[in-house]
Amino acid sequence: MSKAIFITGTGTDIGKTYVTGLIVKKLAESGASAAYYKAAMSGNDRRPDGSLIPGDALFVKNTSGIAQPLETMCPYIYENAYSPHLASRIEGTPVEMPVVKEGFQKLAGEYDFITMEGSGGILCPICFDEAKIQLEDVIKELNLSSLLIADAGLGTINSVVLTAEYMKARNLTIKGIIFNNYHPGNIMEDDNIRMCEYMTGLPTLAKVSPGDNDLHIDIDVLKNLYDEVN
């Protein structure tokens, strides 16, 4: 039975893809059959033949060393570095939930662990045309629990607590927090983490420092965060 989890963050550019790559790498190095998935990806470069390179997917693939084909990692790839709802409108290929779900289910039939990354923060709109799809709709459709990625630095208390409270109010399960850009011994960052734990009731699962090549979490603890795919 395949298991999966969703990776969301407190916002854009807080290191979701970097941390996701380390998560998938940890699973793969344990011998687990691991896959990566993302519904929509913006801000991608083009190959010489004009096709788009799914940058986040390529990063995770290179970081983790998984053999999963790149073309199975993301059904919607956009060139414009905008929120997916706007990039898709400009480029004429709006996200459709059945397509996202089909790609996910195919991976569930082939891999033991699926790590699905979101776009931006939890309020990121995925499609805002005839269909209105928020990131939370994707999470609910696939019935996934989440890990919350946050920066350890100044301002994170507000971002973490607001994100956690929003998700709790919408019955979205959060298994815990991974803090990125953490500097061991930094008094402010240590206090930020302590306050986030106190104000959200969520555990800190790992701390990632700049340049880390491994995720410092017990592999069994990591695997147990994943829930069975329905």
Regions found by a protein language model. Give the residues of each.
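Hydrophobic anchor at the beta1->P-loop junction of P-loop NTPases
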Residues: 7
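Conserved glycine(s) of the Walker
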Residues: 14-15
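Switch II (G3) loop of P-loop NTPases
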Residues: 100, 104-131
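Charged helix-capping and loop-helix junction motifs
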Residues: 128-136, 161-164, 189-194
